[in-house]
Amino acid sequence: SALKKANLRENDKSVVIISAGGLGLLALKIIQAAYNINPIVVDIDDEKLKLAKAAGAAEVINAKDENIYEKIMELTDGGATSVIDYVGAGDTFELASGMFGMKRGGTYVIVGLIGGQTTVQIPMIALGARTIRGVYVGSLKEMGELMELVRSGKIDHLDFEKRDISTANETLNDLKNGKIHGLVCLTHDH
């Protein structure tokens, strides 16, 4: 759903994903399969960025180490057309809506729910004809389209860690503390 609302265009070289965590990596694979796009991925964790690069990201940027605005402008030839934020924190909102290298008419989609507060220069949204959208869950039709994409075999394999359901609380703590790199699947083996 988030990808549909990001106004993605086939072969676009100016798409940015914020987060190289589980959802960001899944989005990367889906964007590659559905739109033939290898996006730029931004995160603050070098290990997660290595996973994103290995998964096919065109470029990876550590938000702590680089001037993101200049780097995005350089890599996208003038700004991102779409930014999809799987973190949803005050800092990532400021990066994206600030308007972090977004082209005129660009779309910023917020998926993550970390939260926080920020200040927005409202005229910059109007002057840049930019769109900010929030997405929480997709439709049944979109789920069907995603499953068809999976069945077609176009989505490349993405490694995941398998853990027993009894470790759910520990897994959530690991996720909260940034100890999970990639995806975890909780199983209930008998």
Residue ranges and their predicted role:
Residues 86-94:
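Beta-loop-alpha module in the N-terminal Rossmann-like domain of NAD(P)-dependent dehydrogenases
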Residues 44-45, 114, 138:
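Residues in the short beta-alpha loop(s) of Rossmann-like NAD(P)-binding domains
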Residues 1-66, 70:
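Mid-domain Rossmann-like dinucleotide-binding core that forms the NAD(H)/NADP(H) cofactor-binding site
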Residues 100-104:
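Helix-to-beta-strand junctions that scaffold the AdoMet/dcAdoMet cofactor pocket
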Residues 81-84:
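N-terminal Rossmann-like NAD(P) cofactor-binding module of classical short-chain dehydrogenase/reductase
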